[in-house]
Structure formats: structure tokens, C-alpha cells
């Protein structure tokens, strides 16, 4: 699919935007009290920061520039994408978290679309800026490889990746490790 309106329409049907807005509304009360607020998880949706002009012809984006709704909403409401704060260039550091090359699983069981390059960064940590919070680092945790067109490949990126011990990994996703300094 290369029709951006269709892509976004399917995305809106998922209720992710409603869930993100509910989180934002609830977190506003915490922010008023000076709390540190984080939003993290597998969103099953890429970031709009990774689908702009510089990546439109990479990773099977097929010329599309997509302002994915959930990430756009969070950023518009003041939240920071922690990985992109440290690694702002999605070409050099795409930060792919799916599909991870879990060596104990055959590639076709790790992929939704084995004929495509479906690598995406769909696991995130967002935070709301606070004078008592400083981001220190952002890393990917998991296999150094991914699945592309049904095949295992080793990533050739500048992403800092912490590989699993003994090359064992329990998931088809990689993790995101963000380190913050918190002032008291």
C-alpha cells in the first residue's frame, strides 16, 4: 500500500490514538503535580520521525512519507521520543525493533510479511521533559540481526545494540533501553 490516506485510515481504526489520548489526559494530572511521566511499549505502529523525506526510499517505504498518528500525537503534546533524542538520524540509526532475528525460530514465523522489508522501530520510550530528568543514553537490546524478505540479515547501522547472552532471545521484538539521570 502506498496510499498514505489508506495507511492512516487503517491506523486510526486500531484505537491506538484513543488510547494515547487517554494516557495524555490522565498524565496531565500527574504533570501538574510535578511527576516524571513516561510512556513506553510496543505500539505496533512506526514513528512519523522514521517515515520522512530522508527515509521515503529506504526500507520498503516505497516513496511514502507517513505522519503516523500515535507518535505525532505524543510529540505534539510535548512528549519526547527518547531514542530519537539521542539518535536523531533515522538513516544512520533506524533503531529497528521488529522483526528481531530470534535464532531459535524459523524466519517465516518471525515475520508478518515475509516478502517485504518490514523492519520498523515499533517499541518506544517517550518522556515528558522535566527539569529533574536528563536522558543519558539510548540503546537497542536484542539480536544484531533482523528478518528481511524472509531471510536473516545482520544489521549494518550505527545503532548501539546490546546483544543477548549466548545469542538466546525470547521474542520477535528487540527491546529499547533508555538510561536517564534523575535529580532529587
Place the predicted regions along the sequence by residue:
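A structural motif
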Residues: 1-3, 40-45
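Metal-dependent phosphoester-hydrolase catalytic domains
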Residues: 28-38, 45-184
Amino acid at each position: 500500500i502506498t496510499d498514505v490516506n489508506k495507511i492512516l485510515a487503517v491506523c486510526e481504526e486500531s484505537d491506538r490514538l484513543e488510547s494515547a489520548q487517554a494516557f495524555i489526559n490522565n498524565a496531565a494530572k500527574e504533570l501538574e503535580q510535578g511527576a516524571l511521566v513516561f510512556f513506553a511499549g510496543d505500539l505496533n505502529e512506526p514513528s512519523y520521525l522514521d517515515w520522512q523525506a530522508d527515509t521515503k526510499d529506504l526500507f520498503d517505504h516505497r516513496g511514502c512519507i507517513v505522519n503516523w498518528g500515535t507518535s505525532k500525537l505524543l510529540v505534539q503534546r510535548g512528549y519526547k521520543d527518547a531514542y530519537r533524542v539521542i539518535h536523531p538520524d533515522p538513516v544512520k540509526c533506524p533503531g529497528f525493533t521488529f522483526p528481531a532475528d530470534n535464532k531459535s525460530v524459523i524466519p517465516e514465523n518471525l515475520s508478518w510479511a515475509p516478502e517485504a522489508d518490514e523492519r520498523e522501530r515499533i517499541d518506544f520510550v517517550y518522556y515528558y521533559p522535566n527539569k529533574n530528568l536528563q536522558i543519558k543514553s539510548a540503546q537497542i537490546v536484542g539480536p544484531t540481526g533482523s528478518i528481511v524478505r524472509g531471510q536473516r540479515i545482520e544489521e549494518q547501522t550505527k545503532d548501539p545494540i546490546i546483544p543477548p547472552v549466548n545469542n538466546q532471545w525470547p521474542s520477535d521484538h528487540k527491546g529499547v533501553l533508555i538510561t536517564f539521570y534523575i535529580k532529587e
